[in-house]
Structure formats: C-alpha cells, structure tokens
Amino acid sequence: MATLLSALGAAASGMDAQAMRLRHLSENIANADTPGYQRKISTFRIGDDGVALGPVRLDDRAAARVHDPGHPLADASGHYDGSNVDLVLELADAREAQRSYEANLRIFDQARQMSQSLFDLIRR
C-alpha cells in the first residue's frame, strides 16, 4: 500500500512541477516582444516527496538587437535590446511539458485505480 501512495505522491508532484513549467513557458511566450525580457528556464530537483520545481534561472543568451529608430528605448543608432525568447523553442518545450504532465496524470490514475481495487478486495 505504501508503494501505491508513493506512486500517487510522485505523480502528483510531477504534475505540479510540469504545471509550473508550463506557467513559466507561457510567461516567456507572452513576453516574447517585451524589450529587455530574459527567458525563464525551469529546473527540477528530486526531493523526498518526488520531483519539484527548482530555482528558476534566467537565460543569459544575448537579446536580439532590434532596429526601430522611432522606439522610445532606441539608442542613437536606432537599436534597442529585444527579448531572448525563441518562440519555436518555447512551443516545443510547452509540448514536452504537456506530454510529461499527461504521463504523470496517467500514472496517478493507474495508481488510484489500483488502490481502489485493493480497498474493494479488503472490504469483501
């Protein structure tokens, strides 16, 4: 029984971590056109209760230089720092996070069904 509860806990923590990862990815996508925005990178750590979201890092890649002389942030040459968000990468990461979430959900559901079957057997 403890193993089933561990599986439930691990799957639930995995779903929580992937949900937070999706949140950070959606923030990156929403701010892709925000000047000076740095992409957030989610990290994970293994804890006693399963997986958890680790510290969020900022991507240190250089931001794209955008030429727009009329922009309020433009320097004398008409350039300003855009964001370092790559939408293709963010969408691929979001798809991966969604699939990881769904896999954890299936594990959670299977463990729940197994524990329910065990309880039904004990009641007989």
Question: What spans do the regions from the language model cover?
Answer:
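Amphipathic alpha-helical polymerization modules
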Residues: 1-124
